[in-house]
Amino acid sequence: MQGTKINDLYEYLSNGHEVSFSYRGDDYSMEPDGDAFTIWKYGNNSKCICRYEIPESCDTKSAIHDFLNAKCFNGQSFMEIEQDVVVVIIY
C-alpha cells in the first residue's frame, strides 16, 4: 500500500477518519459509519461495495480486522489487494 501503513490505517479508522484510495484505476472511500464500516466505490454509478456491521461484543481493533478481511473486491479482501492500493486522502 502506498500513502500509509496498515497499522496507521487501523488507527485512522478507529479514530473515525475517512480514507480515500485508488485501486486499479477506480476511486474508493473507506469510512466508519456509526455501528458499521463501509467501502464506497465512486464513479458514474457510486455504490457501497461493503458494509460491515460491528458486533456489539466486538472491540474496535477486531472489528477493523474483520472489515478489512471481508471479500469486497471481486472475491478478494482489502488485505489481499492492499499491495495495489494507493491512499490518496485521509479526512
Name every feature range the model reports, one short phrase each.
Residues 28-29:
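Short, isolated positions in well-ordered beta-strands
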Residues 51-91:
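Mixed-charge, Lys/Arg-enriched low-complexity segments
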Residues 1-22:
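Negatively charged, low-complexity tracts enriched in Asp/Glu with abundant Ser/Thr
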